[in-house]
Amino acid sequence: MISIATTYYNRRPQFINTLRSLEISKVKDFEVIAVDDCSDEDQKIDDLEKRFKFLKVYRIDKEDKWYHNPCIPFNIAFSLCKGDKIIVQNAECLHHSDILIRTEQNLNDSNYLSFANYSIDEDTTKKISKHEKIKEFIDSYPMNDNRFDFYGNGVNGWYNHGIYRPCAFHFCSGITRKNLIELNGFDESYANGICYDDNEFLYRINLKGLKIIFEDDFKTIHQYHERVNYIKDNSTHLEAINRNIFNNITQRRLSYKVNNRNVF
């Protein structure tokens, strides 16, 4: 079984598009664990469990949120996963290719699969929902003709690609349950800042000796979304917190396992 672990906040139309893209996979034995990280009432996704039977939603209430970084809700998602293979991804990343079947066939305990991720702008994102069948959009979007590197937020370009931007961050990636347990999820010392959670996770994947495989022929699409308001106002300070942790603590680690508690 494959588990897809994701965190979600105020991007309901984009997430519905992602779920629609999963419906057309040849793989049927999978689940989506989505941790709703205090979304507004009109953006909640609990009702989508009836429409998408593979979806399981865990909601965090606003009074229980003490952190800024998604490492906390991601670790909650990991703890709820039942699959022996886990896809770690953002809620807004729809599957342009059959990521599930590639994960089923190629993921093992010695590797980490990094699926290509292409960013689309706001106008293109709005057009997706107009397609009655998500495959119509997937088949019509000429991603292979757009080979320039990503150069800003909300524009068309590669977020992750083995040739054009090989960062291997978890826009959409595959890792076995065994390896994720041994890593013990994301490092929760990053909870009070923003960014660098992806850097630290990748650093420990390398430290563990997993082979990073860029799956450029298996693509995902990052749909446009606005930044969280409180992060907009305080981003410089919050990013500095985690940059300091990464530079002065993470990069001096000798062990790939983190946290003082077992995530699983």
Question: Where on the chain are the PLM-derived regions?
Answer:
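Conserved catalytic core of nucleotide-sugar-dependent glycosyltransferases
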Residues: 78, 96-97, 101-184, 188
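N-proximal low-complexity "stem/linker" segments adjacent to membrane-targeting elements
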Residues: 1-21
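Cell-envelope/extracellular polymer assembly enzymes that use nucleotide-activated donors
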Residues: 1-3, 31, 200
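A conserved acidic beta->alpha catalytic loop
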Residues: 36-45, 62, 93-94
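Short beta-strand-to-loop acidic/aromatic patch adjacent to the donor-nucleotide binding site
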Residues: 83-96
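Short, acidic, metal-binding catalytic loop of nucleotide-sugar glycosyltransferases
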Residues: 20-29
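Glycine-rich, basic loop-to-helix element that forms the pyrophosphate-binding segment
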Residues: 63-81
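C-terminal catalytic/acceptor-binding lobe
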Residues: 167-169, 189-264
